[in-house]
Amino acid sequence: MTANEPRAYREGIAAVISQLRPEAEIESVEPNALDTSIERFSPDMVICSKATDALKGRVRVWVELYPENAPLSVANIGGRRMEYAEIQLLDLLSIVDKAEELAN
């Protein structure tokens, strides 16, 4: 699931992941609908601009892109926190792969 701003970035990330990881089901939602979308879809992974308490409590793998406009991104992968100074597409794809491994 992608729920980050700006919208073009959110949709671009979703499109690229869909092309490069066709087995992954991707939902793009507005950031303000993140919590209700987590309840509705029960995603294995979320990419967002702000990690909410609901996200942290219900999703095992998530990426918070540049929180509070900070120069880094934060990921949680099965309870392990990782920071990326300049997260790249390959990093996101690797996290998608790890989310799939954890889901199986």
Which ranges hold each PLM region?
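Hydrophobic beta-strand segments of well-ordered beta-sheets in folded domains
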Residues: M1, S42-I47, V59-E64
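Short, charged N-terminal beta->alpha structural module
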Residues: M1-P31
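Short, well-ordered alpha-helical microsegments
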Residues: R10, L34-D35, A54-L55
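Short, glycine/charged-enriched secondary-structure capping and boundary segments
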Residues: A14-I17, K56-V63
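Acidic, metal-coordinating helix/loop segments flanking the phosphotransfer/catalytic sites
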Residues: V29-M45
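Short, polar loop motifs at secondary-structure junctions
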Residues: P31-A33, C48-D53, P67-A70
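Short loop/helix-cap segments at secondary-structure boundaries that form the rim of catalytic
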Residues: I38-R40, T52-R60, L72-A75
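Ser/Thr/Gly-rich flexible loops in soluble cytosolic domains mediating phosphotransfer, phosphorylation
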Residues: V61-N104
